[in-house]
Amino acid sequence: MSFNPELATKTLEAEGLRCPEPVMMVRKTIRNMQDGEVLLVKADDPSTTRDIPSFCRFMDHQLIAAQTDQLPYQYLIKKGLE
């Protein structure tokens, strides 16, 4: 799937934050979302390229797209597996 930020229902600006803050903020934000909603995460910490996909697998969310070729890194996360 190509990266389409318009799919997002919420946006989390995590630029300038360092590990583990971006993933902690993703977890807090996604907790208050409904299943099926999509979160756009913008971050510039290189560890997010590893941590966000791992978070999605561990917490049963879908990483539907990622753009990590340039800063800020951007991720589209769909809450839940459905």
Curated annotation (Swiss-Prot):
InterPro entries: Sulphur_carrier_TusA, TusA-like, TusA-like_sf. The gene is tusA. Disulfide bonds: none annotated. GO terms for cellular component: cytoplasm. This is Sulfur carrier protein TusA. Belongs to the sulfur carrier protein TusA family. It comes from Vibrio campbellii (strain ATCC BAA-1116). HAMAP family: Thiourid_synth_A. It is found in: Cytoplasm.
